[in-house]
Each structure stands twice: as C-alpha cells, then as structure tokens.
Regions:
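Structural signal for interior beta-strand "rungs" in well-ordered beta-sheet cores
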Residues: 2-87, 91-93
Length: 95
C-alpha cells in the first residue's frame, strides 16, 4: 500500500515500508528508511541515511510540505511544514 505522487525521487538503497504516501516532488536521498504509516509531503527532502520511525494506523508520521530532514537523522514524530530537523532523535533547527 504505497502511493507515489508526480516526480518523486527515490535514490539507491532506500527502504519503504507499508502504508507510505509520498506526495509530488518529494525526495529520498540514498539509504533512507521509511517505516510503515509515513506520509511525506510535497517537496519534502529526506537526507542520506535518515530513518523515519513508523507511525500507527490512522495516525501516521507526517513530514510536512517543504520540510527537510538532515542526513542520519532519526525522526520519531511528525515534522511541521517548512521546518528543518536534524539529529538523533531529530529536533528542529529552523522554522
């Protein structure tokens, strides 16, 4: 149950779990891991080796439109639109 929008870019060695939605122009850098129940917004960028921990049915982890996830980050909660998050666990550095 994966849904991909227009012009989505998925690089080498990425893993995409169940019930994932990727909206238009979203990008996964190499080595990204999306667990189940993840929603990636329009134009969102997920950096190399980042991990998005799974959400739950009816309450996915949402990476907002135009959000950026830094390389190697571990995302454990939803990220609002337009924000940049980095680190383990991921935290905002720019809104």
């Amino acid at each position: 149950n994966i849904s991909l929008g227009k012009h989505v870019q998925i690089n080498l060695d990425c893993t995409i779990g169940h019930d994932v939605v990727m909206e238009d122009y979203a990008t996964l850098a190499p080595g990204v891991h999306l667990s189940g129940y993840v929603h990636v917004g329009k134009r969102a960028y997920i950096g190399t080796g980042a991990v998005i921990i799974n959400g739950i049915q009816g309450n996915p982890i949402v990476i907002g439109d135009d959000a950026v996830v830094g390389a190697g980050a571990c995302v454990t909660q939803s990220i609002p639109p337009g924000e940049t998050w980095v680190g383990v666990p991921a935290r905002p550095i720019r809104k």
